């Protein structure tokens, strides 16, 4: 018969093992929110922090600038401006509560972030309610806010970097929504009228097209009572407008020259990429970082200049973009080396050192973003926006990428058309590219080649004298 002491020790060991196994599970699920849904379809995520004096409200509306009408880019951004048009409202959040209120419009979504004091929760929700349900779309207010956005766009100096980024997007996508700036242009915003904004408000700003996250020192019971009362009346849409558009036409393969005065030249290359929900998205991120490192190694002069490669992913397939600041003397060589890097990614597997460096850099950057107080809800909000089956552990997905994944995705992306743009002074750029690459100058009508006409024969004069 076993002694009680030995049985007690054995039981203690079992309990300890269970505790050790359960610990990572608890750590993984402790950050998961409590979920609720109002009768109008508004999805709720609760991240309680008992005793925290602050509260963060993050409302994600799953429609963005991709739905701007043709020739009216900036329409959804302008609608975002109209949600909280009174400067006193913004001052209240910054001055009175030491927080902030902002509206961010991307191609895929409109996100309202409100940071304030937990004891002012009811008032914060009331401000949100007024912006969503009682949006002031009077002719006078629309004119005032539209003029303010146009002035902001005109007064904001567009750097050569932004010119190149916009040009490569337009070159790759043409008239497709991702080819125009989400913030709009002065000319396009001026075309947006009140009827456009009212229609966009009715189509997209609906309760069942949104998810609200509450993070901080507010109990779920208190929050539910307030949300039912103030956001319960928010109108539900009969049908969610799907993100479907006619596919863009094949892009022009000639290098586009954009005339921009300045001492440097901005070089861009791009290919059609993957969507945010694509299982290859994390692989494309690592692929981009490996591409950047190979380009830097092939062109030592880039080490002292801004250089990047990135995978831009949206609800629909985005773009794989490489870019650097070069000179008109080195632009042809830099373009050639970038193309060689693209070829090498399809034929030469990434080394273990390349993979480790890329994954470590990306993981560190992502960790820095996710540790911000108002970023706790982002994986769950993204899951709704991009129709993911579950919130993604992006760091774990990055770390699982291997060399064969990189080569497979490189062949998937780069077997399609790769486009290029150079932004700088056009005269030296034309001289630099002449004889190396076919090019087109933006806004310049190509001079037609002279026609080869046979020489005119002299008339035969048979008139008698």
What residues fall within each predicted segment?
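Bacterial N-terminal signal peptides
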Residues: 11-23
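C-terminal regions of mature proteins
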Residues: 28, 211-216, 248, 357-465
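Short acidic/His-enriched helical or mixed secondary-structure segments at domain edges of catalytic enzymes
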Residues: 148-167, 246-264, 301-302, 348-399
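An aromatic/glycine/proline-enriched structural segment found at the starts
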Residues: 174, 182, 207, 211-275, ...
């Amino acid at each position: 018969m076993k002694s009680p002491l030995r049985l007690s020790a054995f039981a203690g060991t079992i309990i300890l093992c269970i505790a050790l196994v359960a610990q990572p599970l608890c750590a993984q699920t402790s950050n998961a929110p409590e979920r609720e849904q109002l009768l109008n379809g508004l999805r709720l995520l609760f991240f309680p922090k008992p005793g925290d004096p602050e509260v963060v409200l993050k409302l994600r509306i799953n429609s963005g600038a991709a739905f701007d009408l043709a020739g009216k880019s900036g329409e959804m951004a302008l609608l975002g401006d109209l949600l909280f048009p009174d400067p006193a409202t913004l001052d209240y959040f910054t001055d009175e509560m030491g927080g902030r209120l902002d509206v961010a419009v991307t191609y895929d979504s409109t996100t309202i972030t409100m940071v304030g004091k937990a004891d002012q929760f009811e008032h914060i929700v009331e401000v949100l309610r007024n912006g969503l349900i009682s949006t002031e779309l009077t002719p006078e207010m629309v004119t005032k806010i539209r003029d303010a956005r146009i002035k902001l766009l005109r007064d904001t100096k567009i750097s050569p970097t932004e010119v190149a980024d916009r040009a490569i997007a337009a070159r790759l996508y043409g008239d497709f929504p991702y080819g125009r700036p989400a913030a709009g242009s002065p000319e396009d915003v001026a075309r947006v009228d009140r009827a456009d904004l009212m229609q966009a408000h009715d189509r997209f700003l609906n309760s069942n097209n949104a998810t609200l996250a509450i993070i901080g020192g507010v109990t779920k019971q208190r929050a539910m009572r307030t949300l039912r009362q103030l956001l319960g009346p928010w109108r539900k849409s009969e049908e969610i407008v799907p993100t479907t558009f006619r596919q863009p036409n094949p892009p022009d393969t000639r290098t586009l020259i954009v005339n921009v005065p300045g001492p440097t030249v901005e070089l861009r290359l791009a290919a059609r990429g993957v969507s945010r929900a694509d299982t290859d998205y994390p692989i494309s991120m690592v692929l981009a970082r490996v591409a950047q490192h190979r380009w830097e190694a092939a062109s030592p002069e880039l080490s002292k200049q801004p250089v990047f490669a990135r995978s831009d992913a949206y609800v629909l397939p985005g773009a794989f973009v490489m870019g650097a600041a070069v000179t008109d003397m080195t632009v042809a060589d830099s373009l050639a080396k970038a193309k060689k890097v693209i070829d090498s990614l399809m034929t030469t597997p990434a080394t273990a050192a390349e993979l480790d460096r890329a994954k470590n850099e990306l993981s560190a950057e992502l960790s820095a973003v996710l540790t911000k107080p108002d970023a706790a809800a982002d994986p769950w909000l993204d899951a709704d926006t991009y129709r993911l089956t579950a919130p993604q552990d992006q760091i774990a997905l990055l770390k699982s990428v291997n060399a064969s994944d990189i080569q497979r995705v490189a062949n998937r992306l780069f077997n399609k058309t790769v486009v290029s743009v150079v932004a700088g002074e056009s005269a030296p750029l034309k001289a630099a590219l002449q004889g190396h690459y076919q090019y087109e100058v933006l806004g310049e009508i190509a001079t037609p080649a002279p026609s080869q006409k046979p020489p005119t024969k002299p008339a035969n004069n048979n008139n008698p004298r």
